[in-house]
């Protein structure tokens, strides 16, 4: 039924497996030597984490840091860094995972190369919990941008 509906709008449709699991996010910061924040968890108040959960009222609970074991924290941080490096990312990104404790573990959902930066956004909250204040985060992002620009300028 959903596939039939999709084909009413286009001749192509992307089909993905539904994944049930916890939503875990890791902030990554850096150019050549990136580092990962403590992970956070989004606990939606509804079945899906939608626009209303994200932006209206108390739609979701943000757990920072996420309630994970030390080994789970290390694993998801290493996965976030591997994804960040594999995609040759610079500056910042937030890597989002589903955590299926029943067998498959951490599954990458997406990478956000321009993560939210509002007072309710996870990215600055993760760095705050990792010991980096909002102003320090901004300073570091500016330094990373200057370093990237200088490196590119010197290549030509």
Regions found by a protein language model. Name each.
Residues 34-58:
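Mobile, glycine-enriched helix-loop/loop "lid" segments at the mouths of ligand-binding/catalytic clefts
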């Amino acid at each position: 039924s959903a596939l039939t509906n999709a084909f009413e709008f286009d001749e192509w449709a992307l089909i993905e497996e539904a994944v049930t699991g916890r939503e875990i996010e890791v902030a990554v910061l850096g150019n050549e030597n990136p580092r990962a924040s403590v992970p956070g968890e989004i606990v939606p108040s509804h079945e899906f984490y939608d626009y209303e959960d994200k932006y209206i009222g108390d739609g979701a609970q943000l757990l920072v840091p996420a309630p994970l074991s030390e080994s789970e924290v290390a694993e998801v941080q290493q996965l976030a860094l591997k994804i960040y490096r594999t995609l040759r990312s610079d500056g910042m990104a937030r890597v989002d995972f589903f955590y299926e404790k029943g067998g498959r573990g951490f599954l990458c959902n997406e990478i956000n190369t321009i993560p939210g930066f509002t007072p309710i956004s996870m990215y600055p909250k993760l760095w705050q919990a990792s010991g980096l204040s909002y102003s320090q985060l901004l300073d570091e992002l500016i330094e990373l941008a200057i370093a990237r620009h200088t490196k590119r300028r010197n290549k030509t």
